[in-house]
UniProtKB/Swiss-Prot annotation:
Keywords: Membrane, Transmembrane, Transmembrane helix
Name this polypeptide is given: Protein TEX261 homolog
Top-level taxonomic group: Eukaryota
Protein source organism: Dictyostelium discoideum (Social amoeba)
Keyword tRNA-binding: no
Amino acid sequence: MFLSLLILLSYALGFVFCVVCLACGLYYFSELVEEHATVAKRWIKYTMWFVMGIIFLLGIFEDLDFTSLLFSFIGHCCYYTLLTEFPFVTLTGYKFILSVLSFIISHISWFIYFRNTENWYPFGEIIAIFTFCVWLIPLIFFISLAANDNSLPMANSYSSHSNSNIIGVDSEFTKKKSRISVLKSMFAWAKEKTSDITGQKSMKHYY
């Protein structure tokens, strides 16, 4: 009995450790993307072509649902339109909304197809299809895209008010500098909320 509890505890600790490592890796990757946006944009474009080629080859050589493959291909066409403004994105823009809708539709389509008992596939093949045809590009965009600071939990009303009073080239530069990656904003927001709950604030003294 006691050994069974230790096994469950070890699984829980292993899961937490993996989640923390994954979060740290994603945060580091978002830092790299922010510093090298042009290179990141080029690699995302090549990765998108690679995934679209995989979808095309799956439609030729594998007996998969044509509708699900078509939804995945259309979804990646929608993702491709986001590259025109990379690494910035407007969360209320039609490009972003269409991309989110296409991701949801593609995910549901594949889920319904694999849920059908007549379409039995090994678990590894299902994960491979979801990884490349559904999850890969949206995950890359999630950790690399930047959003307007007004649409994130860490929004600063003062900075946005100050930016609105500046015109010309400096205004555009200030707007871009005030945008931070979505993932970094989420980490900062989570850190602030954790500090509020625990009552622990970082105290820095300058002499």
